[in-house]
């Protein structure tokens, strides 16, 4: 049986805004981001970027973050988000939402891992049989779908628990509430460097392009083009580069550089979702 730990249930979506918009301005468009870090860090990272893009593109954007991965998945499926920085539009059940990829972070090949603390006596995946393993949430590609796929294909049965986001899962592992965790390798690495966490990798996936910049088909083409241009040129603009550096410092990660991308760049992720034995839980 699955159970959730680490964050309280939230009755409403968490809205993290990029600042008060004047009443005369157009209604801001929702910028959806899959939550991987704490809500505070998510806001500290994205708010400066969206403020810059809004000013440069003339398109007001508002950060909209669901408290859990499955709720984000449901928002994507219902087409509630105008723009996405996510991979939940590649889930087979969400393909009909019609989001169109227009960019991605440069060098954004990432992997999933199953890890234990460095001093753990567990050395092999098979030793996890029957044990509790924490994951971010049931909609996490790198942190749940890939690790659970690896366990299921090896006929290793674990008792999954869910922390709500990547850092919540790391905290469960760090405090000894579970013996192992399935995680985004890059988020874990950044957290470990920031918090001095020593861990050991039991299994790692192949690299995947992880997150895409996408637009809902209801967004006018000229609006998408304006936002796309602002993002893709951001790193080459001194002011934009400074904003990216400040955002990166908040999460102790290298600054993002956005580059063009297309839907076919993520075909391997779509293939995974069409063949995995992992049940994709949707709301």
Task: Label the predicted regions.
Residues 1-4:
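Positively charged n-region of N-terminal signal peptides that target proteins for export
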Residues 8-19:
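Bacterial N-terminal signal peptides
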Residues 25-90:
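Extracytoplasmic small-molecule ligand-binding "clamshell" domains
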Residues 27-33, 37-48, 215-283:
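An extracytoplasmic/periplasmic, membrane-proximal ligand-sensing/linker region
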Residues 29-37, 42, 126-143:
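Short loop->beta-strand "edge-of-pocket" segments that line small-molecule binding or catalytic clefts
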Residues 70-83, 96-97, 126, 167-182, ...:
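Short helices/loops that flank or line small-molecule/ion binding pockets
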Residues 101-124, 212-216:
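Hydrophobic/proline-rich hinge and linker segments of small-molecule sensing/allosteric domains
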Residues 120-121, 131-229:
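Pocket-lining segment of extracytoplasmic ligand-binding domains
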């Amino acid at each position: 049986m699955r159970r959730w730990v680490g964050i309280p249930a939230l009755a409403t979506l968490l809205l993290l805004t990029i600042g008060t918009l004047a009443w005369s301005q157009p209604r801001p468009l929702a910028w959806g981001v899959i939550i991987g870090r704490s809500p505070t860090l998510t806001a500290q990272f994205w708010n400066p970027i969206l403020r810059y893009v809004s000013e440069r593109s003339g398109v007001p954007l508002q950060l909209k973050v669901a408290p859990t991965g499955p709720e984000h998945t449901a928002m994507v499926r219902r087409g509630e988000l105008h723009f996405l920085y996510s991979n939940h539009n590649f889930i087979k059940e969400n393909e009909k939402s019609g989001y169109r990829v227009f960019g991605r972070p440069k060098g954004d090949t990432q992997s999933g891992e199953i890890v234990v603390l460095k001093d753990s006596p567990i050395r092999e995946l098979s030793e996890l049989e029957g044990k509790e393993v924490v994951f971010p949430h049931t909609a996490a590609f790198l942190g749940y779908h890939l690790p659970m796929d690896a366990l299921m294909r090896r006929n290793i049965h674990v008792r999954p628990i869910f922390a709500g986001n990547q850092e919540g899962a790391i905290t469960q592992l760090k405090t000894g509430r579970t013996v192992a965790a399935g995680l985004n390798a890059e988020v874990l690495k950044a957290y470990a460097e920031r918090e001095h966490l020593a861990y050991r990798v039991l299994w790692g996936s192949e690299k995947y392009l992880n997150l895409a910049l996408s637009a809902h088909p209801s967004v006018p083409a000229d609006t998408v083009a304006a936002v796309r241009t602002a993002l893709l040129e951001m790193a080459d603009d001194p002011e934009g580069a400074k904003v990216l550096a400040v955002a990166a410092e908040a999460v102790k990660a290298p600054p993002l550089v956005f580059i063009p991308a297309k839907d076919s760049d993520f075909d391997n992720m779509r293939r995974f979702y069409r063949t995995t034995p992992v049940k994709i839980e949707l709301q």
